[in-house]
């Protein structure tokens, strides 16, 4: 039984009173109560089970650790103190009322550790014995899967509950103890986490590699040749005088170019080989997230939200509410025998016998995989993406299509390629020409045509040993070695998975958290650490190297797996972790304060209020200068003063007439008066005359949330405003000004600014939906 102390409290004026524990009084003549997590899932399952069942939603967790206290009794075996979630009070009340009206209860929360824990909490709230057969699990919301689960309930898996509880308590201990320590070192509001801090560290260390990287120059040579039949092909220089061609500068390259240019070369060898390119396995959570980032430009958070929608089901005319994919939190590539029996005939009938392998493709599992669920796949082959156009939203359909294509391809025959390689000799220079021709497309029939075209490499005409070919062109090209790339969402998720940090279900919230905390920002889809991110990582590496590192975090994940498997106990894992953590925390409390005083960075800027030399501090938006005599003197200044004189603008303050200076805030640069402190936004004039008043200009502004928009310079006299950038063109249909929207991919879309114009994007979308 999980170690817990359950404290159920409610606020009544200023007093806290203990609630009376709920005692269930089942109604033998009532319905069967099934509790799931979401209303959408409840609706689908109730339709499947029929009138004898009442299906209700818990809306996620109903109990958790308290928000205002740590909620973990360290001295009592790390027992968590659970409280009812105040925003779920009505849900709890409705569930308890239904529990008394029904004859029995089945807990059908998600089939993972989190779902197991929710079921355990529900058993406590609804007076159900967790050791009775009350837990049902299914990996797809289809009639066969639901009915099979109903017939085979099990007791709640208390080992899995302990594993989830251990993760929750570990995260609470680290966050509750480490975050206040960071507040003292940097500024209030920061947070540290067992996994998020390691993810931030990876990003910071990659940035350090990039900054330290020294590019090295090298050159390559590519030559064009023509056969006797006037067929052209290209070849690359590979060797000079029998040694690898290493060209370090332009002089060496020019010499090689002169030795090849205009001269004939002899074909000394031609080799041909066939190879099979095997298909990839169906999606796991992490591979789905990676492909959604790379191919659909979705964030991992958005991907999981859309996948949840597809799993819980959508309303399909003639079929009711249908769950379209299997459970989306999985690390398994396994496919059920039942689905294999469906997909093989589908492939042979739809694409032909040649596309069906002799036996089903089976994929090996990674050593970290728990393999508790199937891979992510469609629940039925009756709903191809083409049948769901107009039913699913655009983004839902794009993700569903990605999952569908990957699954079908995973059970198709391999692609067959023929590779041809020809070696050319021109004096001391050896060149190589290669060509790849696809003989059979196999599983790549499921890929977009652009990608398939790219797999056919350079054309290579028929060549044989002894042929003489003539050079028609030769080029030397300069290159520089490149630093390692910054992490994207996709590459960071891949790295976290490879290193065993976190679990598939945690990746999206981790990436979301480190951005919200401003430890990292995104530039061109790549993660870039902020000054705050660097500072926090530096402190954690220095004082908490024992726990905030890749190996320790990965090992801890393995111990959580062992708890779930019954091979380790909650208490032992927590005790071993806390022993290391408490020692590092105690040491850090002493050493960090000592180092802070000794290594305080002092600037050359003098505080005009008390005469002290101002010190450098770190704030939410980066470095700033503060008076060391705080709290007696609370003077602060921008850090830019420490780097030189302030940049003065040519804009005068409206209040006092002083020339304003440039400052940087959370939404970028702005103007500030050094005399009276008045602020003013930096106005960027588009040069476009306001289409409403025809007097002012359209200028770039920011909303109170920081979003850029374009408004008339005569505001408030003229309230003309547009979200997209206006351009000096007018709509041919209605005469309104045109606007330009630039997407993250760099794509620009020009459209009419008038929402009532037939050509406006939203108007066209509404018209299409109406037609359907």
Q: In which residue ranges do the predicted regions lie?
A:
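Short acidic, hydrophobic short linear motifs in intrinsically disordered regions
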Residues: 267-270, 278-292, 319-328, 483-495
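Short, hydrophobic-biased segments on the C-terminal half of alpha helices
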Residues: 304-308, 511-512
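A short, conserved structural fragment
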Residues: 311-326, 517-526
């Amino acid at each position: 039984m999980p170690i817990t102390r359950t404290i159920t409290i409610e606020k009544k004026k200023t007093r806290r009173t203990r609630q009376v524990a709920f005692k269930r009084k089942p109604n033998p003549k009532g319905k069967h109560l099934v509790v799931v997590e979401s209303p959408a899932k409840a609706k689908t399952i109730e339709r499947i089970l029929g009138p004898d069942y009442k299906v209700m939603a818990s809306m996620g967790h109903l109990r958790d650790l308290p928000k205002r206290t740590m909620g973990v009794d360290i001295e009592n075996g790390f027992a968590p103190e659970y409280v009812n979630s105040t925003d779920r009070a009505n849900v709890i009340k409705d569930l308890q009322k239904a529990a008394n009206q029904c004859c029995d209860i089945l807990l059908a929360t998600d089939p993972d550790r989190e779902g197991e824990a929710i079921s355990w909490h529900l058993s406590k709230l609804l007076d159900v014995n967790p050791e009775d057969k009350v837990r049902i699990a299914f990996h797809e919301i289809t009639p066969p899967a639901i009915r099979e689960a109903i017939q085979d309930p099990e007791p709640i898996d208390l080992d899995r509950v302990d594993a989830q509880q251990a993760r929750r308590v570990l995260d609470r201990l680290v966050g509750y103890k480490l975050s206040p320590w960071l507040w003292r070192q940097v500024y209030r509001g920061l947070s540290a986490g067992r996994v998020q801090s390691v993810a931030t560290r990876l990003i910071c260390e990659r940035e350090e590699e990039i900054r330290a990287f020294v590019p090295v120059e090298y050159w390559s040579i590519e030559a064009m040749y023509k056969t006797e039949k006037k067929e052209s092909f290209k070849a690359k220089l590979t060797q000079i005088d029998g040694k690898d061609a290493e060209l370090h500068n332009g002089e060496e390259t020019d010499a090689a170019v002169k030795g090849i240019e205009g001269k004939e070369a002899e074909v000394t060898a031609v080799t041909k080989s066939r190879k099979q390119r095997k298909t990839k396995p169906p999606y796991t959570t992490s591979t789905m997230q990676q492909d959604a980032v790379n191919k659909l430009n979705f964030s991992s958070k958005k991907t999981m939200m859309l996948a949840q929608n597809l799993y819980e089901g959508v309303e399909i005319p003639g079929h009711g509410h249908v769950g379209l994919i299997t459970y989306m939190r999985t690390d398994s590539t396994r496919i059920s025998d039942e689905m294999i029996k469906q997909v093989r005939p589908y492939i042979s009938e739809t694409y032909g016998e040649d596309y069906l392998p002799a036996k089903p493709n089976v994929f090996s599992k990674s050593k970290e995989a728990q393999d508790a669920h199937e891979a992510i796949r469609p629940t039925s082959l009756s709903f191809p993406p083409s049948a769901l156009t107009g039913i699913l939203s655009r983004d839902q359909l794009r993700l569903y299509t990605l999952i569908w294509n990957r699954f079908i391809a995973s059970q198709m025959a391999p692609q067959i390629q023929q590779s041809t390689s020809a070696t050319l000799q021109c004096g001391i220079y050896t060149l190589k020409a290669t060509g790849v021709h696809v003989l059979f497309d196999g599983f790549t029939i499921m890929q977009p045509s652009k990608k398939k075209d790219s797999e056919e490499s350079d054309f290579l005409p028929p060549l044989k040993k002894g042929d003489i070919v003539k050079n028609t062109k030769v080029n030397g090209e300069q290159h520089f070695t490149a630093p390692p790339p910054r992490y994207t969402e996709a590459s960071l998720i891949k790295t976290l998975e490879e290193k065993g940090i976190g679990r598939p279900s945690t990746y999206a919230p981790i990436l979301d958290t480190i951005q919200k905390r401003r430890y990292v920002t995104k530039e061109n889809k790549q993660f870039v650490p902020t000054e705050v991110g660097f500072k926090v990582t530096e402190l954690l590496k220095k004082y908490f190297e024992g726990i905030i590192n890749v190996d320790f975090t990965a090992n801890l994940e393995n111990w959580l797996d062992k708890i779930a498997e019954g091979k380790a106990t909650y208490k032992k894992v927590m005790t071993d972790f806390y022993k290391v953590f408490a020692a590092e925390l105690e040491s850090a409390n002493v050493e960090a304060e000592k180092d802070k005083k000794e290594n305080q960075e002092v600037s050359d800027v003098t505080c005009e209020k008390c005469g002290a030399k101002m010190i450098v501090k770190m704030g939410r938006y980066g470095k700033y200068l503060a008076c060391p005599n705080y709290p007696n003197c609370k003077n602060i200044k921008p850090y830019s003063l420490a780097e030189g004189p302030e940049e003065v603008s040519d804009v005068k303050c409206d209040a006092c007439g002083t020339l304003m200076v440039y400052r940087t805030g959370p939404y970028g640069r702005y103007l500030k008066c050094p005399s009276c402190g008045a602020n003013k936004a930096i106005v960027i004039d588009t040069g476009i005359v306001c289409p409403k008043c025809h007097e002012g200009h359209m200028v770039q502004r920011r909303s109170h949330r920081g979003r850029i928009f374009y408004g008339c310079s005569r505001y408030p006299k003229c309230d003309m405003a547009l979200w997209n950038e206006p351009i000096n063109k007018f709509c041919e249909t209605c005469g309104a000004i045109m606007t330009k929207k630039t997407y993250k991919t760099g794509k620009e879309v020009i459209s009419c600014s008038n929402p009532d114009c037939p050509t406006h994007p939203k108007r066209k979308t509404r018209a299409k939906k109406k037609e359907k």
